[in-house]
Design a protein with these regions (language model features):
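Cytosolic covalent-transfer regions centered on His/Cys nucleophiles
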Residues: 1-149
Length: 149
């Protein structure tokens, strides 16, 4: 699934006022391309308010997501590097420097993508390289190289 990602699915060096703004900005492309509805963005934020920063996975990465029925039209993903990094309220893994917005249409169509991402992102050095990317082209090249390792 990572091979289907294009430069349009990547935003580099985004400034966000806070974690809510970071989620909104990371989801903006998916909203503009009608992959998700605005209700999905609201649901992602509302879930963090209710449950806490469970979306912060480690290595300063947040995986923003909500339930498919909250407004997903098509399986999609968007990567956003934050500059500067933004606290999400996770004592252990703040601040977040990479937000991955995942829109899944059902319970399992995204599992291959999650598996591929986990293999890449569990290495903190990989995350650092991705976050330091100068542009979407470099980010995509690095992501594809890391996937092959």
């Amino acid at each position: 699934m990572l091979e289907k990602i294009s430069e349009e699915n990547i935003s580099i060096g985004v400034h966000a006022a806070d974690w809510e703004d970071a989620i909104r900005k990371s989801a903006q492309y998916l909203l503009e391309t009608k992959k998700i509805e605005n209700s999905y963005i609201d649901a992602m934020i509302e879930t963090v308010h209710k449950i806490g920063p469970y979306i912060v996975l480690g290595n300063h990465v947040a995986l923003a997501h909500a339930r498919p029925e909250c407004g997903v039209n098509q399986l999609s993903v968007h990567f956003t590097t934050l500059n500067p990094p933004v606290p999400f309220g996770s004592e252990k893994f703040d601040p977040v420097s990479l937000v991955i917005t995942l829109a899944a249409v059902d319970a399992d169509s995204h599992l291959e993508l999650i598996s591929e991402l986990a293999n890449v992102l569990m290495d903190e050095e990989n995350v650092d390289k991705l976050v330091e990317s100068k542009n979407a082209s470099e980010f995509l090249r690095l992501l594809n190289e890391m996937k092959e390792e």
